[in-house]
């Protein structure tokens, strides 16, 4: 994966035949696997015994990983299109990739021909063994999007029925089969040469004598006299002939005979081309074992011979047993007898069956067979009575040859099971015996089995074939890691993990040597020749094989120039011969640097090598594709020539350039390179010295995202009062608008709703919670009435006096009476009338006018002896001398008198006078105190002291809990005022400060909306403006200075807005810049997305910082502005003092608020359900506002499509191939394309030359589709999990948008087969991944997270999904419904349950963990670490870089350079893994000087705690990013 979704531009400055004959080559009997088994698909290996052969093979992993692109493959493909070709290439060089390219080309031509009404033709891929039928069929299915079927004799009698073949030809366009199957098919005229369009021969060196390959050519191909009806021939082999010590002339003659037979010409590549493409062979080593003992008879052998030596058919068994005694040891010879008689018995049974059907056979009689069967049973019983025991690792039981093999295998399997080994033997019994031996002596990490040819025992053909296939499958999966194999494994079996091949029995031919060596496919692999000491025959066999291989290489090297591909030396010679005056050149005006045709190749290579790559495996060289074309060169009399397209890696700023037509390929390549360099210079990717400008250009663009930091803070003004209160102020209102406010779940005491009267209609604000003493939430609900209350001067005065009395009695604030300065009025309402208030013609009827008049006329009263005691209950008591002493009276306390001591439970804090209850009730200062003036017989009341708590928007804080725990106290009434405010109304007024604070926050948020001209609800607007901690933007981190009670902060909306901003800017550059590529898209989008750009809008133009809410509720700032304070706290402060508030805001916070507002605009108008363009108009408007760029001028969604101009490639007529693709895609996803060429573009990889179809690659679409899919994923998470924070959302978005998931979806849909690409690495990587992920899905039994555990897929698979989404979006005229439908059908089912462990932990994986375990566990090394430092580079045109290093025993072995330490370390880990994985522990110790002593061996001895500690130590050693 791009690690956990991270992508960073990377600086990769350094990168980091005939076969031996044996029993396996017997003539094979017809197979009896049924048609039903072949056709039916079954699930998983739990029932392997019942799986069909085809289904088993369909899950095999047969790819070889190729680490570089190969230009010779393209040249060979282009040649094979033009003429019949025999490709002579070494094993592991990607011959099958060339065949796939050729098949794709031929099938596209076939589709066009069929569309024209031509007769249907088939392509045949011929192989030499049943195994290879299914293997190659699976390979082709991954690379072709037409039907491919593998056929072998396993289909039995149905192959002799015309209906079978007609059905196969109807549903497939490619048949993979053994040559004998094709011969039989053609013999019965089910197929003819004229009905074929392509014949491919795999391992073509078999085409000789009477081999089926030869019969196809001699009996059928040659007999088609009309050459125009013959199919194209493409043959592949590592060696066209087996040299066998013959002279070079004989080899040339044999090669000519092969060419004649196949009607083809040999083409090969030079060693320099292989070296240039990093084709490496395994390291070869010779293991010499001491001379074997002469053949001898063991004691058991002697006993068997004494008893049964007279039986003539047993004689060969005695000979074989003596041979095993010599080659394998005593134990193997004795063990041989245990199954030798069983084998013989099976053979006799077969003969008896044959006698039943063949009475003319006279060699045997039934009586003779019966007699021999009796002796066989007797001998079997005789052997079984002996206890052979287990072999010991000693010369007594084992031969020196087996002991040497054990030594080498132990080197690889001493610690882990990771190695994969194939041991080649000559005889079937040798493989079986070695398997039995190593079951005992191989150790806990060696898991072995045998791989032998299909035998011919009666009734067992199917089982034997099935067993062979399952064994290979287990070997690929790692359940087996060592195979003892006969020559059946020599040809064609691709096992990428195989890193050790042992020739236990030496090859007998050069082809056997070359083919078996080719099985070692791992990059760190070894090929081991086992030779007997002083055995001249062995030495000569080794020398002859190498000599014959050299003869063959010399033969290839001596081929004429037109048969050799990619000869670098020849190209250099041609370039030197060029004369600059004949071709254009460029001289830079500033520096005088000169670019010529010749130098352009090296300039371009240097540019690519130094260009940052996000993918370590991406090809790091230009690819040149040369096509024949009519020449414009006047010097070419034949007017035939070549045109070249140069293709750069997909991360480069320009991908493709087509040169001019020239008569020579080399000049055509120079032309393309020259034009590319000119374009790079024009766009400033090359500087005046023709060096990359990357160190100046890319960092500036990339750092746009990092241009601001939260650590950089500014001191900004903060608005604390909304403009709403200022409307019509300084006037006396003639009417007021009423808003009723209530708490839906009550308060701590019974309460009365209140009415707020305002000069203008109050906006309808959302409900919000306040928190009661017991932490229960109760929602404040308001309803605004639009019918005003008409006022008289008397009524207005009454309302004003009442409101000011609230401030005086409850909050101890005395304001000057000034109606014109009032912001609002607070009045009680009659609760039972609230429900019908909207139906009232006069809203004044809801007001509690009795209470209002009572308070107006008599704000309070005092106790006197004449007062009734009933009037003292449930009253609000105010201490006129102390603003902190307010009480609710609960009941009389008749058991107490004023002179009694203050009860012990009454809190003493801040009370100086505690002599008695009366003394406690008087709070006058000492000088004015005289408690004797109070009546000494007045009653004592039990009251509830009203706490100082004001911030009801937050839960009760710890410091408040102590006060709230003990509110009961006792007072005498006479020293206090008894307010005429009703107690329930007072209870409501005590939460008024929190209500006013939140109301004002909403109103300020609406002010911000007015400034921005955005229609957003108060709730969302306030959420977008709320920053409740110093580090709100650091999701998942512990909050610093967190302020409770502020409501939801901007984090979630910012997360949503960031996503929509990406969609909108991606879409705008997509439609406005039709000629630019993905690189330029990224730059333009980055400049709009960057925080610095958002800052300029928010700070410079709209001053959005004023409206950001960074402070929680303040006891000082909620009071109304404008009124003159006469008494109370803050008297000395002017209004300007407390209104001029500032706050510190980080630059990133301001930018985040911008994105949050985009998210708010999106959420406000996105209705859900069926999408309409209007849903997103307001969000688009917000993006235009904040992006503030000419690259985004759209104000509503429909503006995007209005700005889109369909490119010519989209509207051009579709070919039959493109229509066929659209039809196939529609079968998987229900959408019919209006423009099939647009769909085709979504499947074209950047490596595919543009000139082949004149359709651009998917890069532009992938750029857009990435953001569209992001939107779909985030909408799903955002609305399904409304309470999850951005950290959780980000972590759970990570698996959704990962390449790993989208790659798995691509395979599940089968769309990997439709991708058109021209890079060998992708063919093998896709094949590897397809087999692995399909196997994981089968094993998962329906679990949707099966894809998490598989390897990282090629990024192109995920790109295809993103490009397809963009394609349907564009084709549908920018209708997001089609994106949503794709998400709902194919993606959403994977994420219905986000609590799966695989998803919860997805984002926490890291490559360094793999490296840590590899070094600590597999190799047992404790002296290693990672480090990073800043360093200068030696590359021209480069500045400083970060070097990340992997040190082993104080020596740096692996490193990576980049402009980010974080990513450089990841790449350094990848580089180390690439070199270390597959090495056996002994070789690691040898290469890297490791002498660490580890406690215990093997996986059982691993201390996981120690390993985990090592991981932590490693991460600690890495340190922070530089």
Curated annotation (Swiss-Prot):
Biased composition (Acidic residues): 1-12
Domain PAZ: 859-980
UniProt-annotated site: Important for activity, residues: 1355
Name used for this protein in its record: Dicer-like protein 1
Domain DRBM positions: 1409-1478
Alphabetical list of CDD domains matching this protein: DEXHc_dicer, RIBOc, SF2_C_dicer
Function statement: Dicer-like endonuclease involved in cleaving double-stranded RNA in the RNA interference (RNAi) pathway. Produces 21 to 25 bp dsRNAs (siRNAs) which target the selective destruction of homologous RNAs leading to sequence-specific suppression of gene expression, called post-transcriptional gene silencing (PTGS). Part of a broad host defense response against viral infection and transposons.
Domain (Dicer dsRNA-binding fold): residue spans on this chain: 600-700
Positions bound to Zn(2+): 1421, 1449, 1490, 1492
Keyword Metal-binding in record: yes
Domain Helicase ATP-binding, residue spans: 76-258
Annotated ATP binding sites: 89-96
Single Gene Ontology BP annotation: defense response to virus
Segments forming domain Helicase C-terminal: 408-576
Positions bound to Mg(2+): 1262, 1359, 1362
EC code(s) of this entry: 3.1.26.-, 3.6.4.-
EC category name: hydrolase
Superkingdom in the source lineage: Eukaryota
Keyword Repeat: yes
Residue ranges of every copy of the RNase III domain listed in the record: 995-1166, 1222-1373
GO molecular function: ATP binding; DNA binding; helicase activity; metal ion binding; ribonuclease III activity; RNA binding
Key words of the record: Antiviral defense, Antiviral protein, ATP-binding, Helicase, Hydrolase, Magnesium, Manganese, Metal-binding, Nucleotide-binding, Repeat, RNA-binding, Zinc
Family matches, as InterPro entries: Dicer_dimer_sf (IPR038248), Dicer_dimerisation_dom (IPR005034), DSRM_2 (IPR056755), Helicase/UvrB_N (IPR006935), Helicase_ATP-bd (IPR014001), Helicase_C-like (IPR001650), P-loop_NTPase (IPR027417), PAZ_dom (IPR003100)
Family indicated by similarity: Belongs to the helicase family. Dicer subfamily.
Stretches for region Disordered: 1-37
């Amino acid at each position: 994966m791009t690690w956990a979704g991270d992508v960073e531009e990377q600086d990769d400055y350094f990168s980091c035949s005939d076969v031996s004959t044996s029993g396996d080559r017997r003539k094979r009997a017809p197979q009896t696997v049924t048609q039903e088994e072949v056709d039916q698909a079954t699930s998983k290996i739990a029932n392997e015994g019942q799986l069909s052969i085809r289904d088993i093979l369909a899950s095999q992993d047969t790819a070889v990983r190729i680490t570089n692109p190969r230009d010779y493959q393209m040249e060979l493909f282009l040649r094979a299109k033009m003429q019949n070709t025999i490709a002579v290439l070494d094993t592991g060089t990607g011959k099958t990739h060339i065949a796939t390219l050729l098949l794709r080309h031929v099938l596209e031509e076939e589709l066009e021909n069929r569309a024209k009404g031509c007769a249907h033709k088939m392509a045949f891929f011929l192989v030499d063994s049943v195994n290879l039928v299914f293997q190659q069929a699976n390979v082709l299915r991954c690379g072709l999007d037409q039907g491919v079927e593998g056929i072998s004799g396993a289909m039995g009698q149905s192959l002799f029925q015309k209906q079978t073949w007609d059905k196969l030809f109807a549903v497939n366009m490619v048949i993979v089969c053994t040559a004998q199957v094709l011969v039989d098919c053609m013999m019965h005229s089910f197929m003819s040469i004229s009905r074929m369009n392509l014949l491919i021969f795999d391992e073509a060196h078999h085409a000789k004598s009477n081999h089926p390959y030869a019969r196809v050519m001699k009996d059928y191909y040659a007999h088609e006299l009309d050459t125009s009806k013959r199919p194209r021939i493409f043959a592949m082999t590592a060696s066209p002939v087996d040299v066998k010590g013959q002279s070079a002339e004989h080899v040339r003659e044999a090669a000519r005979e092969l060419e004649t037979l196949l009607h083809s010409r040999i083409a090969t590549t030079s060693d320099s081309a292989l070296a240039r493409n990093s084709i490496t062979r395994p390291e070869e080593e010779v293991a010499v074992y001491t001379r074997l003992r002469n053949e001898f008879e063991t004691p058991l052998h002697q006993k068997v011979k004494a008893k049964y030596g007279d039986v003539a058919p047993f004689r060969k068994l005695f000979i074989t047993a003596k041979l095993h005694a010599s080659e394998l040891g005593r134990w193997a010879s004795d063990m041989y007898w245990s199954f030798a008689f069983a084998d013989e018995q099976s053979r006799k049974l077969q003969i008896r069956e044959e006698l039943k059907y063949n009475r003319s056979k006279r060699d045997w009689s039934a009586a003779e067979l019966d007699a021999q069967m009796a002796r066989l049973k007797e001998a079997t019983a005789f052997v079984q009575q002996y206890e052979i025991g287990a072999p010991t690792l000693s010369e007594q039981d084992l031969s020196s040859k087996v002991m040497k093999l054990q030594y080498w295998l132990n080197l690889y399997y001493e610690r882990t099971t990771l190695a994969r080994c194939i041991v080649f033997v000559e005889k079937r019994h040798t493989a079986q015996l070695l398997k039995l031996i190593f079951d005992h002596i191989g150790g806990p990490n060696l898991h072995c089995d045998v791989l032998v040819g299909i035998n011919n025992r009666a009734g067992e053909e199917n089982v034997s074939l099935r067993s062979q296939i399952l064994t290979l499958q287990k070997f690929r999966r790692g359940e087996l890691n060592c195979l003892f194999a006969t020559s059946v494994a020599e040809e064609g079996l691709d096992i990428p993990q195989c890193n050790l091949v042992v020739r236990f029995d030496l090859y007998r031919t050069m082809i056997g040597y070359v083919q078996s060596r080719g099985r070692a496919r791992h990059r760190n692999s070894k090929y081991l020749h086992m030779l007997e000491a002083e055995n001249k025959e062995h030495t000569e066999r080794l020398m002859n094989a190498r000599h014959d291989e050299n003869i063959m290489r010399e033969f290839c090297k001596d081929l004429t120039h037109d048969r050799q591909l990619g000869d670098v030396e020849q190209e250099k010679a041609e370039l030197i011969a060029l004369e600059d005056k004949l071709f254009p050149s460029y001289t830079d005006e500033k520096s005088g640097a000169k670019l010529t045709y010749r130098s352009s190749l090296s300039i371009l290579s240097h540019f690519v090598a130094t260009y940052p790559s996000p993918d370590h495996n991406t090809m790091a060289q230009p690819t040149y594709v040369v096509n024949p074309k009519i020449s414009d060169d006047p010097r070419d009399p034949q007017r035939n020539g070549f045109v070249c397209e140069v293709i750069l890696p997909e991360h480069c700023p320009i991908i493709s350039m087509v040169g001019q037509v020239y008569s020579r390929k080399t000049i055509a390549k120079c032309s393309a390179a020259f034009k590319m360099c000119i374009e790079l210079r024009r766009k400033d990717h090359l500087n005046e010295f023709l060096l990359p400008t990357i160190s100046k250009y890319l960092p500036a663009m990339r750092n746009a995202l990092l241009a601001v930091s939260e650590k950089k803070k500014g001191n900004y003004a903060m608005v604390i009062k909304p403009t709403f209160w200022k409307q019509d102020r300084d006037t006396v209102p003639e009417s007021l608008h009423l808003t009723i406010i209530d708490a839906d779940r009550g308060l701590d005491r019974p309460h009365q709703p209140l009415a707020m009267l305002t000069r203008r209609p109050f906006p309808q604000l959302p409900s919000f919670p306040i928190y009661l003493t017991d932490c229960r939430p109760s929602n404040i609900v308001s309803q605004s009435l639009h019918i005003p209350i008409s006022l008289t001067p008397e009524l207005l005065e009454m309302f004003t006096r009442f409101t000011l009395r609230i401030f005086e009695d409850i909050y101890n604030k005395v304001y000057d009476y000034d109606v014109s300065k009032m912001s609002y009025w607070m009045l009680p309402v009659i609760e039972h009338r609230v429900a019908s208030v909207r139906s009232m013609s006069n809203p004044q009827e809801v007001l509690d006018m009795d209470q209002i008049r009572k308070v107006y006329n008599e704000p309070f009263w005092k106790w006197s002896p004449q007062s009734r005691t009933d009037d003292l209950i449930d009253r609000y008591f105010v201490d006129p001398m102390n603003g902190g002493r307010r009480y609710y009276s609960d009941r009389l306390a008749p058991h107490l008198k004023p002179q009694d001591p203050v009860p012990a439970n009454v809190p003493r804090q801040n009370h100086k006078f505690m002599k008695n209850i009366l003394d406690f009730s008087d709070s006058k200062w000492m000088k004015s105190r005289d408690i004797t003036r109070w009546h000494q017989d007045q009653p004592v009341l039990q009251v509830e002291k009203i706490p100082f708590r004001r911030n009801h928007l937050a839960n009760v804080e710890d410091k408040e809990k102590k006060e709230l725990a003990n509110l009961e106290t006792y007072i005498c009434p006479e020293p206090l005022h008894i307010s005429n405010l009703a107690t329930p109304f007072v209870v409501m007024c005590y939460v008024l400060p929190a209500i006013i604070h939140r109301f004002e926050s909403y109103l300020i948020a609406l002010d911000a909306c007015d400034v921005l001209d955005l229609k957003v609800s108060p709730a969302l607007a306030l959420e977008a403006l709320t920053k409740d901690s110093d580090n709100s933007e650091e999701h998942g981190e512990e909050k610093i200075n967190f302020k409770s009670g502020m409501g939801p902060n901007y984090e979630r909306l910012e997360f949503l807005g960031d996503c929509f901003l990406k969609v909108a800017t991606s879409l705008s550059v997509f439609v406005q810049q039709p000629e630019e590529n993905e690189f330029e898209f990224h730059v333009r989008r980055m400049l709009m997305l960057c925080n610095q750009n958002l800052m300029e809008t928010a700070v410079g133009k709209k001053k959005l910082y004023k409206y950001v809410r960074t402070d929680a509720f303040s006891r000082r700032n909620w009071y109304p502005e404008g009124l003159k304070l006469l008494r109370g706290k803050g008297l000395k402060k002017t209004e300007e003092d407390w209104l001029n508030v500032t706050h510190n805001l980080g630059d990133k916070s301001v930018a985040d608020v911008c994105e949050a507002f985009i998210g708010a605009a999106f959420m406000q108008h996105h209705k859900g359900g069926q999408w309409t363009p209007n849903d997103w108009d307001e969000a688009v408007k917000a993006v235009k506002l904040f992006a503030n760029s000419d690259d985004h001028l759209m104000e509503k969604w429909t503006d995007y499509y209005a700005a889109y101009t369909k490119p010519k490639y989209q509207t051009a007529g579709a070919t039959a191939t493109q229509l066929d693709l659209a039809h196939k895609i529609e079968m998987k996803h229900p959408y019919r394309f209006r423009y099939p060429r647009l769909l085709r573009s979504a499947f074209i990889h950047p490596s595919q030359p543009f000139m082949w179809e004149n359709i651009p690659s998917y890069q532009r679409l992938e750029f857009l589709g990435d953001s569209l899919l992001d939107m779909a994923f985030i909408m799903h998470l955002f609305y399904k999990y409304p309470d999850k924070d951005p950290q959780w959302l980000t972590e759970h978005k990570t698996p959704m948008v990962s390449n790993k998931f989208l790659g798995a979806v691509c395979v599940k849909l089968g769309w990997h087969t439709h991708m058109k690409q021209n890079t060998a690495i992708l063919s093998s990587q896709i094949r590897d991944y397809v087999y692995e992920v399909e196997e994981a899905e089968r094993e998962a039994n329906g679990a949707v997270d099966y894809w998490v555990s598989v390897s990282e897929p090629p990024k192109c698979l995920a790109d295809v999904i993103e490009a397809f989404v963009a394609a349907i979006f564009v084709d549908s005229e920018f209708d997001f419904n089609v994106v949503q439908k794709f998400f709902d059908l194919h993606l959403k089912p994977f994420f219905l349950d986000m609590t799966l462990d695989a998803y919860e932990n997805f984002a926490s994986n890291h490559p360094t963990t793999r490296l840590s375990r590899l070094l600590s566990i597999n190799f047992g090394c404790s002296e290693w670490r990672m480090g990073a430092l800043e360093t200068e580079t030696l590359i021209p045109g480069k500045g400083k870089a970060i070097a990340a290093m992997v040190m082993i025993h104080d020596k740096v072995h692996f490193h990576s350079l980049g402009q980010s330490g974080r990513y450089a370390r990841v790449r350094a880990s990848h580089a180390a893994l690439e070199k270390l994985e597959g090495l056996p522990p002994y070789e690691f110790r040898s290469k890297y000087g490791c002498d660490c002593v580890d406690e215990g061996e093997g996986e059982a001895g691993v201390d996981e705690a120690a390993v985990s500690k090592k991981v932590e130590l490693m991460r600690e050693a890495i340190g922070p990013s530089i």
